[in-house]
Amino acid sequence: MLLLSLALTLISAPASDTCDTKDVCIGSPGIPGTPGSHGLPGRDGRDGVKGDPGPPGPMGPPGGMPGLPGRDGLIGAPGVPGERGDKGEPGERGPPGLPAYLDEELQATLHELRHHALQSIGVLSLQGSMKAVGEKIFSTNGQSVNFDAIREVCARAGGRIAVPRSLEENEAIASIVKERNTYAYLGLAEGPTAGDFYYLDGDPVNYTNWYPGEPRGQGREKCVEMYTDGKWNDKNCLQYRLVICEF
């Protein structure tokens, strides 16, 4: 209604503008026209900034058939050894072996060992460092040390300090002492009673060859030495004497 009144007022109003034929007359603005129809859609705009990742979706259905097994991996480091298991039951008794005299391989081995042993004894005997009496062998390395050191040397070699238990053994040891021209300790030691001597294993002495008047150390000389003539004398154990071992 307001627009209609305004239009009538403009129509009834006298024209105040005059213009010549040569001039362009400019009138008052007209009534606004009706809106036009929509234009064509515009072009797509530029991509926007990348958004944050969305939440994980639900688990999908299982896939197809399982694939083939992969190749074996490298062998790992050895594990810690386990605890020792219980001892097993004894096995069945085996068949009896051949008698030694029928075992050709054993006989050949024994023959070879015997041959090498005889060779060694022969060589050392020529050097004057070994004497064999019965089942015993007496040997020296030519060194002179105290009694305890001799025991250790002989033990390391698998023997013990030489000690005669018969006249024949005494003569064998005496021959080494004479050749080396050095007294030697024997495998004897004085017991609790002065003048009573025993073998080192504790057994009483069953053979002696004391020098006249010996022993006379009265408990102060606990060891026994052999002279170059084979006679015995009690002596303190700290002197240096020839190493002679028996095997």
Swiss-Prot record:
Entry GO MF terms: carbohydrate binding; metal ion binding
Modified residues (4-hydroxyproline): P29, P32, P35, P41, P53, P56, P62, P66, P69
Main location: secreted
Keyword Methyltransferase appears in the UniProt entry: no
InterPro entries: C-type_lectin-like, C-type_lectin-like/link_sf, C-type_lectin_CS, Ca-dependent_lectin, Collectin_CTLD, CTDL_fold
Domain Collagen-like: 27-99
BP term (GO), one: respiratory gaseous exchange by respiratory system
Signal peptide: 1-15
Glycosylation positions in this chain: N206
Localization of this protein: Secreted; Secreted, Extracellular space, Extracellular matrix; Secreted, Extracellular space, Surface film
Cysteine-cysteine disulfides: C154-C245, C223-C237
Binding site for Ca(2+): E214, R216, N233, D234
Gene Ontology terms: cellular component: collagen trimer; extracellular space; multivesicular body
Ranges of residues in domain C-type lectin: 132-247
Presence of the UniProt keyword Ribonucleoprotein in the record: no
SMART domains: CLECT
Composition bias, Basic and acidic residues: 41-50, 83-92
Homology family: Belongs to the SFTPA family.
Quaternary structure note: Oligomeric complex of 6 set of homotrimers.
Task of the protein: In presence of calcium ions, it binds to surfactant phospholipids and contributes to lower the surface tension at the air-liquid interface in the alveoli of the mammalian lung and is essential for normal respiration. Enhances the expression of MYO18A/SP-R210 on alveolar macrophages.
Protein name: Pulmonary surfactant-associated protein A
Gene that encodes the chain: SFTPA1
